[in-house]
Amino acid sequence: YQALARNVNAYAQKMIMKRENIADRGIWTAKKRYILNVWDSEGVRYEQAKLKIMGIEAIKTSTPAPCRTMLKDAFKLLMTGTEDEVIDYIEKCRSEFKNFPPEEVGFPRSVNNLQKYKGVSDIYNKGTPINVRGALLFNHYIKKNNLEHKYSAIQNGEKIRFCYLKTPNWMHENVISYIQDLPKELDLHKHVDYDLQFEKAFLEPIKVILNCIGWETERKNTLESFFS
């Protein structure tokens, strides 16, 4: 920089350059949205590479806890592994996910405006947000089944979880919310849609990254693989 300052007749040499990150691998989804496998950050050298995620909201507070860990490990594998290794890991996560109870795979949310969306002739009004709809259904069937002594009704401002349900089911609905535990008395555990939960909590966030590098989330049959 001293030589450059002389060449441009600078009054004083005040140019400096700081090293931000040195990485051996990176994936960009858009401007200022990327994942880096960083070995050196602002002059600090690491013995093991660290993941730097910028502008990619894949892991949110609304992500079920098991998927947060799974996504972090998946991103690390993206930086060091192959497409086949990532696909194998996704299948492993899918199998493990189905063994978690609804209380762990439900989407955490807060709930408000219960009275606003409560229906007069129906349980809820048209256009009710899914987490609120699940809460109104919970309150209705807890009361209908005389379970109010065991489970508190969901109130405005409470933190809840909600799960998608497979249809058909006896409730004829595709969602249920709950505060801590999904009441076994409602007989809905067997109707929890684990495939849809996994799709929205894990696959959709990771597909944003994989699509940028042309990788798949599962193996697809091709003519080449058919004849091999």
Language model feature labels by segment:
Residues 2-228:
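DNA-dependent DNA polymerase catalytic subunits
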